[in-house]
Design a protein with these regions (language model features):
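Bacterial N-terminal signal peptides that target proteins for export
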Residues: 1-9
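Bacterial N-terminal signal peptides
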Residues: 8-17
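Bacterial Sec-dependent signal peptides at the C-terminal "C-region" and cleavage site
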Residues: 16-24
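Electron-transfer interface patches adjacent to heme c in soluble/periplasmic c-type cytochromes
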Residues: 23-74, 86-147, 154-158, 164, ...
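An amphipathic alpha-helix/helix-turn recognition signal
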Residues: 75-76, 173
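N-terminal carbohydrate-binding/catalytic regions of secreted carbohydrate-active enzymes
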Residues: 77-79, 83-85
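Solvent-exposed, charged amphipathic helical/linker segments at domain boundaries
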Residues: 159-177
């Protein structure tokens, strides 16, 4: 079985990677990315790609809709809102650090900051806000930081992802770095992000159905039942995009880069841009 899967992945790479190896603009990449998934799943409306595997599998969708009747993230989301609104020791709140008071801004993240040449993520700016106001950073990836980000993202639900790649060679460099990471094979299993979520989206690996990459980050931060089972408390199931990236690297037995590393920021920049136009639906519930 493992040999068969390996041969399939190799064949898929040889057959499908050639167009991606050519020099293209981000906008050309975006159009090709969208078209690939819309051609592959013609019965799935564009907006419904926000729902991952639940947009392409009726049985799993029914299970998910049942979960959403009593969402497991509800208490944690309330905690995230309380933390967001709670004043720092100096009397300021998170709202003082963000445009529009931090409400309905998730669709613009991550973004390229021309002043620093860096990619700014929502979670990174939450901790920057804390430091600016004399507070210690929160642990990246999970816990209170993920809950605060999930609450902020939830205020953008229904707004469409709108990540901008400005006319700046530094921004394009970040984008291309993320694109390269997405299609590069890694780890002992010699697999890429694209192997699972582009070429073989919709296929099963053991009991897991591989979700399409289109709309992939529209529901982050996410609440995963798997994380919930490993931890305790109302925030155990929450995790950020970079926590999930690390988990993917572990699954292919590759070394992770760590939350807020340049590699993961570039990947988030690329992958979110590829889902531009998809409505936000956060936090999502996933297995």
């Amino acid at each position: 079985m493992r040999r068969t899967l390996t041969l399939l992945f190799c064949a898929g790479w040889l057959a499908l990677s050639a167009p991606l190896a050519t020099a293209t603009t981000p906008q050309e990449d975006l159009q090709a990315f969208r078209q690939y998934f819309q051609d592959r799943y013609p019965a799935t409306p564009f907006d419904d790609f926000q729902n991952g595997i639940y947009s392409i599998d009726a049985n799993r969708r029914a299970e998910w809709e049942a979960m959403e009747e009593f969402p497991p993230y509800e208490i944690g989301l309330e905690i995230g809102q309380q933390e967001f609104e709670k004043p720092f020791a100096n009397g300021q709140t998170y709202a003082s650090c963000f445009k529009n008071g931090g409400i309905n801004i998730r669709q613009h993240y991550p973004y390229f900051d021309a002043a620093t040449g860096d990619i700014k993520t929502l979670e990174g700016e939450i901790n920057e806000c804390r430091v600016k106001n004399g507070e210690e950073k929160l642990r990246f990836g999970r816990g209170k930081l993920a809950a605060i980000a999930a609450y902020m993202a939830s205020t953008s639900n229904g707004s469409r992802l709108n990540v901008v790649i400005p006319d700046d060679p530094r921004a394009l460099e970040w984008y291309n770095r993320g694109k390269k990471h997405y299609f590069a094979k890694r780890g002992q299993l010699n697999m890429s992000c694209a192997d699972c979520h582009y070429y073989y989206a919709g296929h099963n690996v053991r009991a897991d159905l591989l979700h399409p990459a289109l709309g992939d980050l529209s529901h982050f931060p996410v609440y995963r039942k798997k994380w919930e089972a490993r931890g305790s408390g109302a925030l155990a199931g929450f995790g950020t995009t970079h926590r999930r990236f690390n988990g993917c690297n572990e699954q292919v037995r590759a070394k992770g880069y760590g939350a807020q590393s340049d590699e993961y920021k570039a990947l988030e920049f690329y992958l979110t841009f590829m889902s531009n136009g998809i409505p936000i639906n956060a936090p999502g519930v996933r297995q």
